[in-house]
Amino acid sequence: MANHPIDQELTSPAEEELTPREIVAKLDEHIISQKNAKKAVAIALRNRTRRKKLDPEMREEIYPKNIIMIGPTGVGKTEIARRLSKLCGAPFLKVEATKYTEVGYVGRDVESMIRDLAVISMNLVKQEFRTKVEETAKQKAEEALLDILLPFPGENKHGSGQITGFATSSTLADEEDRKTHFLETREFMRKKLKTGKLDDQEVELDLPNPSVSQVPMLQVFGAGNLDDLDNQLQNVLGDILPKKNKKRKLKIPEALKALEESEAEKLLDPDKVQREALRRVEEMGIIFLDEIDKIAGREGKSGADVSREGVQRDLLPIVEGATVNTKIGPVKTDHILFIAAGAFHMTKPSDLIPELQGRFPIRVELEKLSREDFEKILTAPRSSLTRQYEALLSTDGIQLEFSLDGIQEIARIAYDMNEKHENIGARRLNTILERLLEEVSFEGPDLPESQRKVRIDGKYVTDRLQGVIQNKDLSQYIL
């Protein structure tokens, strides 16, 4: 289409051909330990790249090998899947298996996860497209705003808000002189606009009303198994109901932003975006199914176990390959990668129904984090916890410095607390660091300049946490 500056097919910016070793190396930048889990997801991602190179007939026959990650909370299960999706620019959805109910019961049915993934895919593609047309949209928005501020005689398409004091009409007799004077004035206005000298001015824009996302009379359909019917009815009514423009008074910076969004929307090719969103969700979608152990049954089934088995049976066709109607069209789930995870303390993977077990052929056990792992988590990742706190407090002029013995002491306390109480993995570090830095976070902005350099060494950590650690009741609830 000639109106759209980008005519080539949209492709994910991160769809590069990384080898499994390179994928693991990139995951290592953010996640400590868990080599086996990283290898499993790296192979799964690489197999997608391999599959794309095959002829269509063979491509259709190759399905993703879904993965079950087994390990306690806080060891990196979710983070591995999340980082993997970012690495390949894939639509990613994390859901909890316990949130779904068997068909016929009140609650969300399992197909809703595919509908949610489709919406994520559409938003992802739209954002990528907007990034590509950002400069064009900015230029068009600037011209549109100048048209409002200083319209050609008799013209004002978007709204009103002319700034007076400029001769733009019959005061100049000659047409050419009038045009030259107008263009000079327009450039003068452009400079004022770019330098922010017009930021206090208000303009009235005639902008399209956002599409109605919910029709009140249909909200009764917004839950449970009627999600799909609700979506279809809203889509139909959205097309039938007239779209009206709405006049809004905005300051110049806000008006410019609103016009940029409006112009970007005009540059967007809805059919192309929808096609790419559909392709992306079907070929690259990743669903992280957490707490799958909670829907695993046990021997001697009670009523609750029977209900859990119902969810498993509803989940089976989605994982196996089905077609689900969504807002962007029918989505085939055959090639969506499912990564399930669970602690499996009270159950084991073999407690899942055999048919579902067969759809998750790869099983990876994640290791419990050691004291050395905690030390690495605090320092090695690109956005490690210590770097995050250093960056946050630097905005108040506080210079945090973590010494080696300070890091070791924090890691030791985290490991010991996990051993003595509930093992929450790396999340224990968050609670400890919050407690440790509570005082400096609160007092920091008011500290004199001479006290704004804070060194977190072993003694600092011990002094602030020893009392809490020694008090068993306190440590259980605070750390």
Swiss-Prot record:
<dbReference type="InterPro" id="IPR003959">
    <property type="entry name" value="ATPase_AAA_core"/>
</dbReference>
<dbReference type="GO" id="GO:0043335">
    <property type="term" value="P:protein unfolding"/>
</dbReference>
<dbReference type="InterPro" id="IPR004491">
    <property type="entry name" value="HslU"/>
</dbReference>
<dbReference type="GO" id="GO:0036402">
    <property type="term" value="F:proteasome-activating activity"/>
</dbReference>
<feature type="binding site">
    <location>
        <position position="427"/>
    </location>
    <ligand>
        <name>ATP</name>
    </ligand>
</feature>
<keyword id="KW-0963">Cytoplasm</keyword>
<feature type="binding site">
    <location>
        <position position="32"/>
    </location>
    <ligand>
        <name>ATP</name>
    </ligand>
</feature>
<comment type="function">
    <text>ATPase subunit of a proteasome-like degradation complex; this subunit has chaperone activity. The binding of ATP and its subsequent hydrolysis by HslU are essential for unfolding of protein substrates subsequently hydrolyzed by HslV. HslU recognizes the N-terminal part of its protein substrates and unfolds these before they are guided to HslV for hydrolysis.</text>
</comment>
<dbReference type="GO" id="GO:0016887">
    <property type="term" value="F:ATP hydrolysis activity"/>
</dbReference>
<dbReference type="Pfam" id="PF07724">
    <property type="entry name" value="AAA_2"/>
</dbReference>
<dbReference type="InterPro" id="IPR019489">
    <property type="entry name" value="Clp_ATPase_C"/>
</dbReference>
<feature type="binding site">
    <location>
        <position position="355"/>
    </location>
    <ligand>
        <name>ATP</name>
    </ligand>
</feature>
<dbReference type="GO" id="GO:0051603">
    <property type="term" value="P:proteolysis involved in protein catabolic process"/>
</dbReference>
<dbReference type="InterPro" id="IPR003593">
    <property type="entry name" value="AAA+_ATPase"/>
</dbReference>
<dbReference type="InterPro" id="IPR027417">
    <property type="entry name" value="P-loop_NTPase"/>
</dbReference>
<comment type="subunit">
    <text>A double ring-shaped homohexamer of HslV is capped on each side by a ring-shaped HslU homohexamer. The assembly of the HslU/HslV complex is dependent on binding of ATP.</text>
</comment>
<dbReference type="InterPro" id="IPR011704">
    <property type="entry name" value="ATPase_dyneun-rel_AAA"/>
</dbReference>
<protein>
    <recommendedName>
        <fullName>ATP-dependent protease ATPase subunit HslU</fullName>
    </recommendedName>
</protein>
<keyword id="KW-0547">Nucleotide-binding</keyword>
<keyword id="KW-0143">Chaperone</keyword>
<dbReference type="Pfam" id="PF07728">
    <property type="entry name" value="AAA_5"/>
</dbReference>
<dbReference type="GO" id="GO:0005524">
    <property type="term" value="F:ATP binding"/>
</dbReference>
<dbReference type="GO" id="GO:0008233">
    <property type="term" value="F:peptidase activity"/>
</dbReference>
<dbReference type="InterPro" id="IPR050052">
    <property type="entry name" value="ATP-dep_Clp_protease_ClpX"/>
</dbReference>
<keyword id="KW-0067">ATP-binding</keyword>
<feature type="binding site">
    <location>
        <begin position="74"/>
        <end position="79"/>
    </location>
    <ligand>
        <name>ATP</name>
    </ligand>
</feature>
<feature type="binding site">
    <location>
        <position position="290"/>
    </location>
    <ligand>
        <name>ATP</name>
    </ligand>
</feature>
<dbReference type="GO" id="GO:0009376">
    <property type="term" value="C:HslUV protease complex"/>
</dbReference>
<comment type="similarity">
    <text>Belongs to the ClpX chaperone family. HslU subfamily.</text>
</comment>
